[in-house]
């Protein structure tokens, strides 16, 4: 399907998180990373990947020449067209966009986590680097569907990582205390314009920042 509409659909994917152990050296291994890309090409049934993103690698990867040599190599082979980075911090993003061939930054940004707008957005816009916003609804908080009695399955990161025990706490509820966030959500509901959901307001607020290229909310089912 994707191959037949390649002139209308841009394919973006991530790579690197499957490196085990998840250490920087894996990101410098051309053969290893190329094998991941080859598998993605096979899985997606496309001839090239429009955007390959490094998936939240160890911090030292962002400043290493080896990283960019590996990515430029994949571009030269025609297996990817562009590359970018999914980051956990603004400092990591700023390090990435120092490099001229970085085309995108994927970063957490929402009403509860606004730091990227303080500095990153301006520089990214100047350098014409796309901003892809992930976790725009703060792991579902900004849907307005949760309350203090809400519970999550044992294998849901909103259960086991609520305090950052498994990985960066910012990846779950944007690092905001759950109960405190519920209070803020109630205040937001009180100022919602008629006919607009909290999810719609939250996504629109993000897109009002002209540095933002696209927002990628998560969905677990067709209704979402």
Regions found by a protein language model. Name each.
Residues 27-45, 87-95, 202:
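Short, acidic/polar
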Residues 57-224:
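Beta/alpha (TIM)-barrel catalytic core signal, keyed to glycine-rich beta->alpha loops juxtaposed to Asp/Glu
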Residues 41-60:
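Active-site groove signature of glycoside hydrolases
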Residues 18-34, 59-60:
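Active-site mouth loops of central-metabolism enzymes
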Residues 8-20:
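A short, structured active-site edge motif that brings together acidic residues
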Residues 1-5, 36-43, 119-128:
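Short amphipathic alpha-helices and their capping/turn segments at secondary-structure boundaries
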Residues 1-10, 41-46, 75, 96-100:
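Acidic (Asp/Glu)-rich catalytic clusters
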